[in-house]
Amino acid sequence: MPHQKILMLFGLLPVATNISTWWNFGSMLLTCSMIQVLTGFFLAVHYTANINLAFSSIVHIMRDVPCGWMVQNLHAIGASMFFICIYIHIARGLYYGSYLNKETWLSGTTLLIMLMATAFFGYVLPWGQMSFWAATVITNLLTAIPYLGGTMTTWLWGGFAINDPTLTRFFALHFILPFGIISLSSLHVLLLHEEGSSNPLGTNSDIDKIPFHPYHTMKDLLMLTTTLTLLLMTISFFPDIFNDPENFSKANPLVTPQHIKPEWYFLFAYGILRSIPNKLGGALALAMSIMILFTVPFIHTSKLRSMTFRPLMQLMFWTFTSTFVLITWAATKPVEPPFISISQVASIIYFTFFISNPILGWAENKIMKNT
């Protein structure tokens, strides 16, 4: 059969029989990246990277281009779906100990940073009020770097303030970075298949494996169909659910919004940044909130890979997950009590997860040794 020849590569790929739905998100991320590249190309055809025309070109895409509203919403809401999938993908990796495949985990964390950079540059492109001010606040953090900060900021802006050169280079970066993401994704998958994926038990599954096709292709397609249905329903019925009302106004450097905030998927890092009153301290905490993922494979001390049989780590993991949601919510609120205190406490708990990981692993080993 012709389709069997096409899928022979997948058929020859042995996968554990007991992997759950949480392992579907890798293929979903691949689909998301394909959607983003395709819709991004069609948007780039009509977009104008000029501060006087950028906002108007977005309006033109939405109103005049055939199906432009759908392409634009697919790209914008598709980015939110991308981040939902990647956060679940990372959470699964943390819970089931997938990070012990070090090369795969480190390449994946690098991918996350590249994806966040790409999304940030993309958020600036419509040149709406919130786009402009979010870009001003975030890029200004570079000035906190001793000695080099001012020069780096001027170089990034292409002048002494955010202006036309800034928008041009942000568009160039937003266009080129996805190709780097695709290349690194290929390496990520290649490194994963060197060792093979883990499973919910965290055990060696060599004795109990099945072909990827047709079993897991069907399983992936079901989840993919469900997610794409939700995406299209959101685009059709709630197209502005993730948009900030301020961004429907053209950027005005003379009027500051009452409350500056980036897109929802950056709010956990932005909340940690805001919770520290010192500029350099906040910038370091912002960087560490993502960079700390690089340390996870090296601080694992438990003899058990997965958290399935580690109740104390399960408690810490779900505390960490709820803290992530709490910081995201608090970052949407103005910088005033009680939101400042909530963000500060939540930020401490966020980093405590990574500190407690090796300590609890060591304690579990002691308990197992003594029983």
Swiss-Prot record:
Signal sequence extent? none
Q: Cite the entry's keywords alphabetically.
A: Electron transport, Heme, Iron, Membrane, Metal-binding, Mitochondrion, Mitochondrion inner membrane, Respiratory chain, Transmembrane, Transmembrane helix, Transport, Ubiquinone
Q: Which cofactor does it need?
A: heme b
Task: Name a GO CC annotation attached to this entry.
Answer: respiratory chain complex III
Cofactor binding comment, as recorded: Binds 2 heme b groups non-covalently.
Residues annotated as binding heme b b566: 89, 188
InterPro entries found in the cross-reference section: Cyt_b/b6_C (IPR005798), Cyt_b/b6_C_sf (IPR036150), Cyt_b/b6_N (IPR005797), Cytb/b6-like_sf (IPR027387), Cytochrome_b (IPR030689), Cytochrome_b_C_euk/bac (IPR048260), Cytochrome_b_N_euk/bac (IPR048259), Di-haem_cyt_TM (IPR016174)
Q: Mind listing the GO molecular function terms for this protein?
A: metal ion binding; ubiquinol-cytochrome-c reductase activity
- The answer to whether the entry has keyword Zinc is no
Membrane-crossing ranges are 25-45, 69-90, 105-125, 170-190, 218-238, 280-300, 312-332, 339-358
Q: Write down the PANTHER family for this protein, in alphabetical order.
A: CYTOCHROME B (PTHR19271:SF16)
This chain's function reads: Component of the ubiquinol-cytochrome c reductase complex (complex III or cytochrome b-c1 complex) that is part of the mitochondrial respiratory chain. The b-c1 complex mediates electron transfer from ubiquinol to cytochrome c. Contributes to the generation of a proton gradient across the mitochondrial membrane that is then used for ATP synthesis.
The record describes its quaternary structure and partners as:
The cytochrome bc1 complex contains 3 respiratory subunits (MT-CYB, CYC1 and UQCRFS1), 2 core proteins (UQCRC1 and UQCRC2) and probably 6 low-molecular weight proteins.
Give the protein family: Belongs to the cytochrome b family.
Indicate what this protein is called per its UniProt record: Cytochrome b
Q: Which species is this UniProt entry from?
A: Boa constrictor (Boa)
